[in-house]
Structure formats: structure tokens, C-alpha cells
């Protein structure tokens, strides 16, 4: 948001921002995050004990793996998945359990189909909605079921909430809206997508007090604090009326219609996503996602990663980004049409 840039520019002149800021996060930033949860999601948080500032969602996820996962611990997440979940699992020697997400279920995993033995040995369940790469959104009932399972079997839920705000507003569900969710879960938030601050590196981890306290202790020794002027800018964004987020969501909705609608008119099977910043579509009959993505690049000069970049579950699919402006997206659809693949 432009007003965040203005705040950051003025904050450069604050001599306090040239010093180490509080490692937990500046109080104004943490209070703003708590205000955002209250105003947007109706969730009450104690900013002192339930919020911790991190340098983006990946920083928060990496810290959670470091404090929670030992070699051999079981970590589960849906397939397709954001690649960092797999990489962090491998780096920590975790047992990786992939939960198949299927198109007919709206690209959500069927939690009832998971064998009880998996739940009994599980240490961490990672959820990510709105989802990367599919754009899927999870209803409140899905989160309620996940929380019930976590309470019954004693595992922790980590919800990667990086894409919140960029979809249909009444479907943007925070896991923490579920009663008792903070007993068994943490949510990782990011300012990167909803405020177009990807390069600024600011976010937060919130929820379970014990986990947040452990993450703070880890970060004191192995991490650093978020730059002061970035926290100042982030606090203003979080405390704003969120009209900038609504405008960005409308812009992405328009771009989504250009790409998804264009692909459908060409006969492609496109997932009807209402969130995120990507379009997830199936390669034509007889093509793998990898082969079709290669052909798109070679013939149409349109770049989009094949679904196999996000796990075996995406092997027949391709992801296209909506980050470019409308004219370039229309040109991409035109090129795909002209390629006649």
C-alpha cells in the first residue's frame, strides 16, 4: 500500500529504528496485528503472549520446524503443497506424510480418509488456505474438524495464512476463529501478499502461547528482529480500514477472470478458485503437466510451473500467476490460443 511506503520513508529518520528493536516485535506492530484479528476475523488475542513478529511467513515456518520437529517426527500436509513444507521436512529428517487433495473435493484433503495410526503418531499438521498452488479455500467446518482431531490425538496444527485477503471475503477463514483452536494450533500471517509488501519481509506467528514462547526463545539466539521502519509501515497497514486489501482482491478477481475465463473458452479444465493469486488448470488429455508447461514456454513463450513442482498430486496440472497486469495476461491467453497445443 502506498501509505505504508510513506510511513516507512518517514520512519527512516527515527533514530530508534537505527537500533535493535524489540526481538518479539515492536509493541505497536504486535498491537496492530491483534487489532487486525479482532476487526477482520473477530478473534481476540493477547499481543504480549500470543503474537511474535517474523521476517515473512517462511521465516515463521522455519522457526516452527526448528523448535518442534526432531528427526523421525511425523509431519503431514496436503499434496499438492508449497515446496518449502517438503524441503523443511527433509532438512529436519521428518517422516513426511502426504494427504492427497483431489479436485472433486475442492482440492482439500479428506481428513476422514486418513488412517487413525497416522493421527496417533503425528507431530505437526500443516494447512494452507487460501492455498498455493491451487487457490483452494477451506470452510470453517474443515478447520473445526482439524481442531477436533488435533485435540483428540495431541498434534499441533500450523496454518500458513499467507494468502489471506486475496479472495472472496466471506470465505477467508482464520483457523483461530474455531473455539479452542489456540490450544492446539498456531497461524502464520504475512504482509507480503495482502499489502503488496513481498520484499519488505514482515509477518507474525500467533495462537498457542507455549509455542509462541518457545519460538521467541529460539529466535533470540538464531534469528533477528524485523526492521523497525518496516514494522511501522506494517502497523499502519494492519490498522487501516483494509480498503487497500479489498481493492487488491478485486484486481486479482478481474485478472483471474481474464485467465481462467480465457482458458475455459479454449476448452481447458480450470479449477474454480476464489482465492490466492494463481490459476490452476489441467493439461489437455494425453499431456502431463510437465510436458505441457514445457510446450507453453517453448511454443507460446508463456511461463508457468508444472504441478509436479508442488508434488505428485499436481502431475497433470499447471499453475499460472496473476501478478502481471491485465494486458499481459490477455496476451498470454492469446498466445496459448494461437499455439494450438
Regions found by a protein language model. Give the residues of each.
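N-terminal small-domain helix-loop-helix segment of the aminotransferase-like
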Residues: 1-56, 63, 237-240, 341
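Conserved core segment of the aminotransferase class I/II
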Residues: 6-9, 178-253, 257, 261, ...
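Conserved PLP-anchoring active-site segment centered on the Schiff-base-forming lysine
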Residues: 67-89
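A short helix->loop->beta-strand "cap" motif at the edges of active sites that frequently abuts
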Residues: 73, 94, 152-156, 181-183
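Helix C-cap/helix->beta junction micro-motif
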Residues: 92, 149-153, 266, 300
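Active-site phosphate-binding strand-loop segment of PLP-dependent enzymes
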Residues: 97, 101-169
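Conserved glycine-rich beta-strand-loop-beta hairpin in the small C-terminal domain of fold type I
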Residues: 235, 252-260, 270-282, 314
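PLP-dependent enzyme catalytic core of the Aspartate aminotransferase-like
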Residues: 286, 295-305, 310-341
Amino acid at each position: 500500500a502506498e501509505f505504508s511506503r510513506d510511513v516507512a520513508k518517514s520512519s527512516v529518520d527515527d533514530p530508534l529504528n537505527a537500533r535493535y528493536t524489540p526481538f518479539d516485535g515492536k509493541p505497536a506492530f504486535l498491537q496492530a496485528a491483534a487489532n487486525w484479528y479482532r476487526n477482520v476475523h473477530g478473534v481476540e488475542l493477547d499481543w504480549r503472549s500470543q503474537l511474535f513478529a517474523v521476517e515473512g511467513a517462511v521465516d515463521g515456518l522455519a522457526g516452527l520446524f526448528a523448535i518442534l520437529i526432531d528427526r523421525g517426527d511425523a509431519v503431514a500436509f496436503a499434496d499438492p503443497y508449497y515446496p518449502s513444507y517438503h524441503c523443511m521436512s527433509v532438512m529436519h529428517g521428518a517422516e513426511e506424510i502426504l494427504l492427497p487433495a483431489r479436485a472433486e473435493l475442492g482440492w482439500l484433503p479428506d481428513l476422514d480418509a486418513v488412517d487413525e495410526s497416522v493421527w496417533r503418531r503425528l507431530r505437526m499438521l500443516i494447512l494452507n488456505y487460501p492455498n498455493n498452488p491451487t487457490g483452494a479455500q477451506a470452510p470453517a467446518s474443515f478447520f473445526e474438524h482439524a481442531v477436533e482431531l488435533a485435540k483428540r490425538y495431541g498434534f499441533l496444527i500450523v496454518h500458513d495464512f499467507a494468502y489471506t485477503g486475496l479472495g472472496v471475503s466471506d470465505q477467508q477463514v482464520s483457523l483461530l476463529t474455531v473455539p479452542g483452536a489456540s490450544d492446539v494450533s498456531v497461524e502464520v500471517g504475512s504482509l507480503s501478499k495482502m499489502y503488496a509488501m513481498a520484499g519488505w519481509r514482515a509477518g507474525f506467528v500467533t495462537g498457542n502461547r507455549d509455542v509462541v514462547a518457545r519460538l521467541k526463545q529460539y529466535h533470540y539466539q538464531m534469528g533477528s528482529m524485523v526492521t523497525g521502519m518496516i514494522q511501522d509501515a506494517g502497523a499502519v497497514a494492519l490498522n487501516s480500514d483494509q480498503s487497500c486489501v479489498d481493492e487488491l482482491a478485486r484486481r486479482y478477481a478481474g485478472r483471474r477472470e481474464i485467465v481462467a475465463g480465457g482458458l475455459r473458452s479454449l476448452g481447458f479444465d480450470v479449477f474454480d478458485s476464489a482465492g490466492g493469486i494463481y490459476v490452476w488448470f489441467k493439461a489437455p488429455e494425453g499431456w502431463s503437466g510437465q510436458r505441457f508447461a514445457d510446450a507453453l514456454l517453448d511454443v507460446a513463450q508463456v511461463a508457468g510451473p508444472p504441478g509436479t513442482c508442488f508434488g505428485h498430486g499436481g502431475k497433470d496440472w499447471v499453475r499460472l500467476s496473476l501478478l502481471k497486469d491485465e494486458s499481459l495476461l490477455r496476451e498470454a491467453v492469446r498466445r496459448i490460443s494461437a499455439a494450438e497445443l
